A protein has these predicted regions:
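Basic, amphipathic juxtamembrane/active-site segments
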Residues: 222-247, 333-340
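Terminal substrate-recognition subdomain of acyl/acetyltransferases
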Residues: 307, 329, 333-396, 499-561
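A conserved beta-strand-loop-helix scaffold within acyl/acetyltransferase catalytic domains
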Residues: 276, 401, 405-480
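Acyl-donor binding region in acyl/amide transferases
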Residues: 451-454, 460-536
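Substrate-recognition element of Asp-dependent hydrolases with the DxDx(T/V) motif
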Residues: 244-278, 291, 328, 412, ...
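Conserved Lys-Pro-Asp/Glu-containing loop-to-beta segment of HAD-superfamily phosphomonoesterases
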Residues: 301-322, 328
Length: 561
């Protein structure tokens, strides 16, 4: 879902959602959302109706359970009700939602909840088969189970919003006045969650956290008190809070979020503290890089980002000092700098409240991301030691494996397609089902390219797809991860499609470049290194078959396609 334009969403409910959609309409943060309210009180008719003509980017369904599950309403009102009857109705509702979801690229369903003051049958309310709270929890689990394999249905947790709102979540006054059950604080929480979900699905999650050291990763000023006297762990409540904060950062790192350091300190002393302090949860190898010196932090951040080849829009900067935070906001506005609590005991909570690290599925490459970047540092160090690029490439002992799309690489292929910006010819964003539908057309073909070398297995890092018609091939997707750019993988990919074209009697290969604010590196490669001829008026590149296909030395290619 590309949210650079205004997104259109249709909102379906059995209570008054007007306050919620008003907030969405007037919120200026991306993505901008144009709302449409479905007719009130027509839930099942709409879910089961003919929705083929719907022209919305996404759907959003938020319901009160007792108004859509009749057996559950009977239970609430004290009638003897069979649990199996309730679950049958839940399954029927899920089937209707699944049918409705076919009209959308994405459909968001809000989990069911009851007012926090609702006591059900009191002490026995969590008892199996008789308790209303017990039943509601299992109804929500049934929703999750039924939607688990549906790639375009996302279940949002309303209990988070209600919990954050506390006792003010439900409003009796609004309910009796306008059939609006929730106070606006709940709607504001829901707005944040929905927009965060859209960003996550669109591959716009943050990839990296840059951290200060003093009073950020540990308590105290290292240069003044020495590493032995830092507040970190031990029998100290502040030290314990810093250990918990580091543990939370470590968890994010294990999920694929990169960590780095930018700190005003003496580098040798700082690295000694990281190495020697027995309570350090984060070790040196947990960070993909550091800039520890007395230079301006904005300069150091830009230096670090250039070295690891990550754009500032993918970065979060955490620093306890409000002056430093303001400096980065002013000098590098693309970097997200959250407000940070003065109370060090609140650091872990503040980190968990950031919703910019959510991901829509995790691949092997995500879990190994820090190792891959550390391996890239080793490659760059080796490059600086050798006399030429060819010597460097030869020393890497690179192997490229070519495959067609399959069940094993589908998730990673879609992830790479939806996240890659720089080396991306047309910046096409597709879901798994949409990509499979496209590839399964008889005149379409897609290859993936995996890269390994002596330092690491970078995994699936390249995608090339084509459409062929008689004697003409059009290159659609030409995508390469920034981790392997500039290592002749681009040329290997083009050689593959040229050789394929020759074998199949093709007369013409054309690639149309669709510019975005982020994919100029792709254009630069095609202009200077692809060997294709640029046709400016068409913004396209043409291969001249009178040319010989250049040999790419020092790289082994294994073709499993």
């Amino acid at each position: 879902m590309n949210y650079q334009h205004e997104l259109k969403g249709i909102f379906l409910s059995n209570f008054n959602l007007q306050n919620f959609v008003n907030y969405l309409e007037n919120d200026i943060d991306f993505p901008l959302i144009k709302t449409s309210l479905a007719p009130y009180g027509q839930v099942m008719n709409i879910l089961l109706g003919d929705n083929k003509t719907i022209k919305y980017d996404f759907g959003f369904v938020w319901l009160m359970p007792q108004a859509v599950i009749g057996s559950f309403n009977n239970l609430i009102n004290g009638h003897v009700t069979q649990f199996t009857s309730i679950m049958t109705e839940v399954d029927d509702f899920c089937n209707a939602v699944i049918k409705y979801s076919e009209a959308f690229k994405y459909l968001f369903i809000v989990s069911w909840s009851l007012p926090s003051y609702f006591r059900g049958i009191g002490l026995r309310d969590l008892k199996n088969e008789v308790g209303i709270s017990n039943c509601l929890m299992r109804m929500n689990l049934r929703l999750a189970d039924n939607f688990d394999t549906r790639k375009n249905i996302y279940l949002l947790d309303s209990q988070k919003w209600i919990g954050n709102a506390g006792e003010e979540a439900f409003s009796s006054k609004l309910w009796y006045l306008s059939k609006t059950p929730f106070n606006n604080i709940v709607f504001k929480q829901a707005l944040k969650e929905l927009k965060s979900a859209i960003k996550t699905i669109s591959g716009d999650s943050k990839k990296m956290i840059i951290l200060d050291l003093d009073d950020t990763l540990w308590g105290g000023i290292l240069g003044d008190i020495g590493w032995e006297n830092l507040k970190l762990g031990g029998h100290d409540f502040t030290g314990e809070a810093f250990v918990e904060f580091q543990s939370a950062l470590k968890t994010l790192k294990e999920k694929g979020i990169l960590l780095a350091i930018v700190s005003k300190n003496e580098e040798a002393i700082a690295l000694e503290a990281i190495l020697k302090h027995p309570e350090m949860i984060l070790k040196k190898d947990d960070f993909i890089g550091s800039e520890i010196n007395w230079d301006d932090k904005s300069k150091n951040i830009l230096t670090l980002l250039k070295r690891v080849n990550i754009g500032p829009q993918s970065v979060v900067f955490i620093d306890d000092n409000p002056v430093e935070r303001d400096r980065i906001r002013q000098s590098i506005p693309e970097v997200y700098v959250p407000e940070w609590p003065a109370n060090k005991l609140e650091y872990t909570k503040a980190l968990h409240k950031l919703n910019c690290f959510d991901i829509d599925g995790t691949s092997t490459e995500d879990l190994e991301r820090t190792k891959l970047y550390l391996a890239e540092n080793e490659r760059n160090n080796l490059k600086s030691e050798l006399n030429s690029v060819d010597d460097w490439l030869k020393s890497l002992r690179t192997v490229v494996t070519v495959e067609t799309l399959n069940n094993q690489n589908l998730q990673r292929t879609v992830q790479l397609m939806n996240k890659t910006n720089q080396m991306n010819l047309i910046t096409r964003r597709l879901t798994e089902s949409e990509l499979l539908s496209w590839v399964n057309q008889k005149n379409h073909k897609l290859w993936t390219f995996g890269v390994t070398d002596k330092f690491s297995n970078s995994g699936l890092t390249g995608i090339l797809s084509i459409e062929f018609d008689d004697k003409i091939i059009r290159i659609f997707d030409f995508i390469l991860s920034c981790r392997v750019m500039g290592r002749k993988i681009e040329e290997i990919m083009l050689n593959h499609v040229i050789q394929y074209s020759k074998k199949n009697g093709v007369d013409k290969i054309v690639a149309i470049y669709l510019p975005t604010p982020k994919n100029k590196p792709c254009f630069d490669f095609w202009i200077s290194k692809s060997g294709f001829t640029f046709i400016e008026k068409e913004n396209s590149f043409i291969w001249n078959f009178s040319k010989s296909v250049p040999e790419i030395a020092n790289i082994e290619v294994i073709n499993n396609s």
